Regions:
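Interaction-surface signature
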Residues: 1-46, 131-169
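Membrane/wall-proximal cationic-aromatic binding patches
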Residues: 5-114
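Extracytoplasmic small-molecule ligand-binding "clamshell" domains
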Residues: 110, 117-118, 128
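Conserved beta-strand elements of the Class I
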Residues: 87-91, 121, 149
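A broad structural signal for alpha-helix termini and local helix breaks/kinks
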Residues: 115-116, 144
């Protein structure tokens, strides 16, 4: 996670959070990607989601994108887990996670807005490949028991993520 100053505005978009990150119990955290634990730390057990129930700083593209993570660290409203009915479970990488788009514009929100009767759960996480996505699906499927699973695959980089995951299993 890095801090940068936007050339156009000269503003440090993330500066407001630097002090927060240094606190013993921060209320805002940078996004955490599970693949960091595989590659850099060689961890055998780790969370598939990010840090739960905290405001997560997600992206910096001349504007700051943040979301409040759910109880498992995914990009969902927390109360979605309380609804017994799960119509659609989304699984995928950063596109599914909602990279650089505000929560109201991510794929989960767009599908949810299509029909207010639908309950859509997003288990996408940036930097994940097919093996990690399958593991997430396997971990949460019985808890969620969705009517449908939409597995969103991006051929540009997901094959490379799969190769990385197979090599670092």
């Amino acid at each position: 996670f890095y801090l940068s100053i936007t050339k156009e505005t000269g503003k440090d978009h993330l500066g407001e959070f630097t002090k927060e990150f240094k606190k013993e119990k921060p209320s805002k955290v940078p996004v955490v990607y599970p693949y960091h634990f595989i590659n850099e730390n060689k961890q055998k057990i780790f969370s598939f989601g990010g840090i739960s129930n905290l405001e997560t700083i997600f992206c910096h593209e001349d504007y700051l994108v943040k979301y409040k993570s759910d109880r498992f660290g995914f990009n969902n409203p927390n109360e979605i887990w309380d609804n017994k009915k799960k119509d659609i479970l989304l699984i995928g990488d950063s596109f599914t996670h909602g990279m650089c788009v505000f929560p109201e514009n991510n794929i989960r929100s767009k599908i949810q807005k299509y029909s207010s009767d639908l309950n859509v759960l997003n288990l996408g996480i940036g930097g994940s490949g097919s093996l990690m996505q399958y593991a997430i699906l396997k971990e949460y499927y019985n808890l969620v028991n969705p009517k449908k699973v939409l597995w969103i695959y991006y051929e540009e980089n997901d094959i490379h993520d799969l190769i990385f995951e197979k090599k670092n299993h």
